[in-house]
Amino acid sequence: MADSSWRLMQYDSIAINVIVENKKGGINFCDIPYSDDIQKFNEDYLRLTSEAAAECESSSLENMMVVGTSAMIGTELDSIVNQYTDKFCNPMLMWGSYRCGLFRTALPISFQFHHVQMDGSHAARFLELLRVT
């Protein structure tokens, strides 16, 4: 028998979730509404992350599809493993330190998709389009 609490949701807007180190040395998360206007996005990012750091409180945007991100700049990584729950079924993007070579610099990233958003073939197509652009 199917669980009737599950439903497919469509959102009109998205947000980017970031982790913020707060003034007490702990962490909080902060959802930043996405905007095509990079200046507006930057203003929102600076304001909301500053508030989260100063107030030591997390903020979330329940009415938006939230894409999780995490910077793990203290380490090099090739992939991330994330445990999905019924509460957090959003896509995730993580990155580590830059890798500097003789002729190029690379930033390894790890995308994770939940089957709620896309199947494996769709994720592979998205990543291939990202790679060639």
What residue spans do the PLM features occupy?
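A common structural junction motif
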Residues: 53, 130-133
